[in-house]
């Protein structure tokens, strides 16, 4: 499928071009991108300050999407609204088998290590799509960032009557503050 795409060719330079999207591989789905969040990672890549990044790259890992087609068995159907888990890991790796997919040696992040969603459609593993019928596309573009905040709070083990310190009030810091409310007596923000 031929489609337009936005490519960050080098720090500070985007271009639009056309690219070909292959048919979905087995156990992949084609999704239509409806919303894209702009992340701090994207901004750092634009300014040339993202150490895990190679140019050229199609950015976009905070995505709200709709299923177009599926190549394999799935609980999802074309037309369904989905949240996209942008961390592409080997499900059979030792780290993934232990529930630590973020430590998988072959981990790739959409829009960082491989091309992401700044184009109309992409193919992703079916297992990385999560049905989200009650969410808006705008909300879905925030899911990945909110998950990072929730994960940070879960790992912190903070609880009443402890005080929590949050360093920074960017989007992730704000999500941490949101998830800490009701879980700790006091939140200090610096």
Feature names for model-found ranges:
Residues 1-4:
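Extreme N-terminal starter segment of soluble prokaryotic enzymes
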Residues 9, 20-21, 54-60, 110-114:
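Short Gly/Pro-enriched turn/cap motifs at secondary-structure boundaries
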Residues 16, 64-66, 121-123, 129, ...:
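Conserved hydrophobic/aromatic beta-strand scaffold that supports enzyme active sites
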Residues 22-36, 49-92, 133-135:
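Glycine-rich beta-strand-centered segment in the early N-terminal region that forms part
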Residues 41-43:
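Cytochrome P450 core scaffold surrounding the K-helix E-X-X-R motif
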Residues 76, 85-133:
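Cysteine-cluster motifs in flexible loop/terminal segments that predominantly coordinate metals
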Residues 135-190:
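Mid-domain Rossmann-like dinucleotide-binding core that forms the NAD(H)/NADP(H) cofactor-binding site
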């Amino acid at each position: 499928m031929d489609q337009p795409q936005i490519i960050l060719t080098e720090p500070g330079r985007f271009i639009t071009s056309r690219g070909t999207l292959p048919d979905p591989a087995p156990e992949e789905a084609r999704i239509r991108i409806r919303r894209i969040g702009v992340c701090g990672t994207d901004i750092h890549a634009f300014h040339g300050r993202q150490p895990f990044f190679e140019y050229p790259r199609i950015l976009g890992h905070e995505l709200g999407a709709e299923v177009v087609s599926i190549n394999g068995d799935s609980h999802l159907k074309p037309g369904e609204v989905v949240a996209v888990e942008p961390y592409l890991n080997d499900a059979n790796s030792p780290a993934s088998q232990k529930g630590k997919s973020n430590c998988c040696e072959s981990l790739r992040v959409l829009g960082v290590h491989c091309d992401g969603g700044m184009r109309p459609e992409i193919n992703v593993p079916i297992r990385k799509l999560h049905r989200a019928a009650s969410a808006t596309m705008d909300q879905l573009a925030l899911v990945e960032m909110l998950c990072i905040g929730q994960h940070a709070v879960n790992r912190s083990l903070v609880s009443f009557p402890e005080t929590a310190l949050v360093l920074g009030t960017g989007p992730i810091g704000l999500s941490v503050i949101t998830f800490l409310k009701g879980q700790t007596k006091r939140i200090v923000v610096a």
